[in-house]
Regions:
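Membrane-interface helix/loop boundary segments of multi-pass membrane proteins
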Residues: 58-82, 109-116
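C-terminal membrane module of polytopic membrane proteins
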Residues: 19-22, 125-182
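Functionally important transmembrane alpha-helices
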Residues: 89, 96-152
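Active-site His/Glu-centered metal-binding helix of metallohydrolases
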Residues: 57-62, 66-67, 89, 93, ...
Protein backbone atom coordinates (compact mmCIF):
# COMPACT_ATOMS: atom_id res chain seq x y z
CA UNK A 1 0.00 0.00 0.00
CA UNK A 2 2.73 2.45 0.99
CA UNK A 3 4.58 2.63 -2.31
CA UNK A 4 1.37 2.69 -4.34
CA UNK A 5 -0.02 5.53 -2.23
CA UNK A 6 3.20 7.59 -2.19
CA UNK A 7 3.68 7.32 -5.96
CA UNK A 8 0.01 8.02 -6.64
CA UNK A 9 -0.02 11.13 -4.47
CA UNK A 10 3.26 12.47 -5.83
CA UNK A 11 2.34 11.98 -9.47
CA UNK A 12 -1.45 12.26 -9.38
CA UNK A 13 -1.91 15.14 -6.97
CA UNK A 14 1.47 16.86 -6.95
CA UNK A 15 -0.04 19.52 -9.18
CA UNK A 16 -2.33 20.57 -6.31
CA UNK A 17 0.62 22.16 -4.46
CA UNK A 18 1.85 23.86 -7.63
CA UNK A 19 -1.65 25.13 -8.40
CA UNK A 20 -2.07 26.48 -4.87
CA UNK A 21 1.32 28.22 -5.11
CA UNK A 22 0.30 29.82 -8.41
CA UNK A 23 -2.95 31.01 -6.83
CA UNK A 24 -1.14 32.59 -3.88
CA UNK A 25 1.30 34.36 -6.23
CA UNK A 26 -1.55 35.56 -8.48
CA UNK A 27 -3.20 37.11 -5.42
CA UNK A 28 -0.02 39.04 -4.63
CA UNK A 29 1.41 36.63 -2.08
CA UNK A 30 4.82 35.04 -1.99
CA UNK A 31 5.68 31.40 -1.81
CA UNK A 32 8.95 30.62 -0.14
CA UNK A 33 10.23 27.16 -0.89
CA UNK A 34 13.04 25.58 1.01
CA UNK A 35 16.24 25.40 -0.98
CA UNK A 36 18.45 22.61 0.18
CA UNK A 37 22.06 22.84 -0.98
CA UNK A 38 22.42 19.15 -1.83
CA UNK A 39 25.74 19.25 -3.66
CA UNK A 40 27.41 16.00 -2.66
CA UNK A 41 26.41 12.41 -1.94
CA UNK A 42 27.22 12.99 1.75
CA UNK A 43 24.93 16.04 1.84
CA UNK A 44 22.19 14.02 0.15
CA UNK A 45 22.48 11.27 2.78
CA UNK A 46 22.42 13.87 5.56
CA UNK A 47 19.37 15.62 4.08
CA UNK A 48 17.61 12.30 3.51
CA UNK A 49 18.13 11.49 7.18
CA UNK A 50 17.04 14.94 8.45
CA UNK A 51 14.26 15.79 5.99
CA UNK A 52 12.92 12.38 4.96
CA UNK A 53 13.71 9.69 7.55
CA UNK A 54 13.31 11.58 10.84
CA UNK A 55 10.11 13.47 9.88
CA UNK A 56 8.55 10.26 8.54
CA UNK A 57 9.21 8.39 11.78
CA UNK A 58 8.36 11.24 14.16
CA UNK A 59 5.25 12.51 12.35
CA UNK A 60 3.80 9.06 11.75
CA UNK A 61 4.42 8.03 15.36
CA UNK A 62 2.57 11.16 16.47
CA UNK A 63 -0.24 11.49 13.91
CA UNK A 64 -0.90 7.83 13.05
CA UNK A 65 0.20 6.53 16.43
CA UNK A 66 -0.81 8.85 19.23
CA UNK A 67 -3.50 10.92 17.47
CA UNK A 68 -5.11 7.96 15.69
CA UNK A 69 -5.13 5.94 18.90
CA UNK A 70 -6.73 8.84 20.79
CA UNK A 71 -9.48 8.86 18.13
CA UNK A 72 -10.06 5.10 18.37
CA UNK A 73 -13.55 5.55 19.84
CA UNK A 74 -14.64 7.87 17.01
CA UNK A 75 -16.24 6.70 13.80
CA UNK A 76 -13.73 6.00 11.05
CA UNK A 77 -14.38 8.93 8.67
CA UNK A 78 -14.45 11.70 11.32
CA UNK A 79 -11.33 10.19 12.90
CA UNK A 80 -9.58 10.13 9.52
CA UNK A 81 -10.52 13.75 8.84
CA UNK A 82 -9.48 14.95 12.32
CA UNK A 83 -6.12 13.20 12.07
CA UNK A 84 -5.58 14.49 8.53
CA UNK A 85 -6.57 18.05 9.46
CA UNK A 86 -4.08 18.05 12.34
CA UNK A 87 -1.39 16.69 10.00
CA UNK A 88 -2.12 19.33 7.34
CA UNK A 89 -2.21 22.22 9.82
CA UNK A 90 0.99 21.01 11.48
CA UNK A 91 2.88 21.49 8.21
CA UNK A 92 1.91 25.18 8.29
CA UNK A 93 1.80 25.73 4.55
CA UNK A 94 -1.26 27.26 2.95
CA UNK A 95 -0.15 26.07 -0.47
CA UNK A 96 0.22 22.48 0.75
CA UNK A 97 -2.87 22.38 2.97
CA UNK A 98 -5.16 20.41 0.64
CA UNK A 99 -2.41 18.03 -0.49
CA UNK A 100 -1.30 17.38 3.10
CA UNK A 101 -4.91 16.81 4.17
CA UNK A 102 -5.48 14.22 1.43
CA UNK A 103 -2.10 12.67 2.25
CA UNK A 104 -3.09 12.51 5.91
CA UNK A 105 -6.35 10.71 5.09
CA UNK A 106 -4.45 8.11 3.06
CA UNK A 107 -1.84 7.63 5.77
CA UNK A 108 -4.64 7.22 8.33
CA UNK A 109 -6.17 4.37 6.34
CA UNK A 110 -2.77 2.76 5.80
CA UNK A 111 -2.26 2.81 9.58
CA UNK A 112 -5.75 1.47 10.28
CA UNK A 113 -5.43 -1.27 7.67
CA UNK A 114 -1.99 -2.39 8.80
CA UNK A 115 -2.44 -1.79 12.52
CA UNK A 116 0.88 0.08 12.54
CA UNK A 117 2.28 3.52 11.79
CA UNK A 118 5.30 1.94 10.06
CA UNK A 119 3.80 1.47 6.56
CA UNK A 120 2.67 5.11 6.63
CA UNK A 121 6.17 6.12 7.67
CA UNK A 122 7.49 4.28 4.61
CA UNK A 123 5.08 6.19 2.33
CA UNK A 124 5.98 9.44 4.09
CA UNK A 125 9.70 8.74 3.65
CA UNK A 126 9.26 7.89 -0.04
CA UNK A 127 7.44 11.18 -0.65
CA UNK A 128 10.01 13.33 1.15
CA UNK A 129 12.97 11.39 -0.26
CA UNK A 130 11.66 11.65 -3.83
CA UNK A 131 11.69 15.45 -3.62
CA UNK A 132 15.29 15.45 -2.37
CA UNK A 133 16.61 12.83 -4.78
CA UNK A 134 14.91 14.39 -7.80
CA UNK A 135 16.39 17.75 -6.83
CA UNK A 136 19.84 16.21 -6.36
CA UNK A 137 19.90 14.46 -9.73
CA UNK A 138 18.23 17.37 -11.51
CA UNK A 139 14.98 15.66 -12.45
CA UNK A 140 12.06 18.02 -12.86
CA UNK A 141 8.68 16.40 -13.25
CA UNK A 142 6.00 18.36 -15.07
CA UNK A 143 3.27 17.93 -12.48
CA UNK A 144 0.74 19.44 -14.91
CA UNK A 145 1.42 16.80 -17.59
CA UNK A 146 -1.93 15.03 -18.09
CA UNK A 147 -0.22 11.65 -18.59
CA UNK A 148 1.63 11.98 -15.29
CA UNK A 149 -1.55 13.06 -13.51
CA UNK A 150 -3.52 10.21 -15.10
CA UNK A 151 -0.87 7.68 -14.10
CA UNK A 152 -0.86 8.99 -10.54
CA UNK A 153 -4.66 8.98 -10.36
CA UNK A 154 -4.68 5.36 -11.56
CA UNK A 155 -2.21 4.47 -8.79
CA UNK A 156 -4.38 6.29 -6.23
CA UNK A 157 -7.51 4.54 -7.51
CA UNK A 158 -5.72 1.20 -7.14
CA UNK A 159 -4.74 2.18 -3.58
CA UNK A 160 -8.34 3.15 -2.69
CA UNK A 161 -9.65 -0.06 -4.26
CA UNK A 162 -7.19 -2.20 -2.30
CA UNK A 163 -8.03 -0.46 0.97
CA UNK A 164 -11.80 -0.56 0.35
CA UNK A 165 -12.09 -4.12 -0.94
CA UNK A 166 -11.44 -5.71 2.44
CA UNK A 167 -12.97 -3.73 5.29
CA UNK A 168 -12.55 -6.54 7.80
CA UNK A 169 -9.39 -5.03 9.26
CA UNK A 170 -10.75 -1.50 9.55
CA UNK A 171 -12.97 -0.71 12.49
CA UNK A 172 -15.90 1.38 11.22
CA UNK A 173 -17.84 1.80 14.45
CA UNK A 174 -16.73 3.39 17.71
CA UNK A 175 -15.10 0.99 20.14
CA UNK A 176 -17.27 -0.37 22.93
CA UNK A 177 -16.48 0.88 26.42
CA UNK A 178 -15.22 -2.52 27.59
CA UNK A 179 -13.33 -3.27 24.38
CA UNK A 180 -9.58 -3.14 24.60
CA UNK A 181 -7.98 -1.02 21.86
CA UNK A 182 -5.39 -2.65 19.62
Amino acid sequence: YSVLFAAGMFLGLGFVNALAARLVVSLGGRVNGIELPVESPFALILFLFCYAFLPAIEEEAFFRGLITESLSRAKIVPAAFCSAAAFALYHGSLTQLLYQFIYGVGLFFIAKKSGSALPGAIAHFINNAAVLVFSYVGIEIDLFNPFIIAGGVILLAAFVWLIARDKSDIKTEPAEKNEVSR
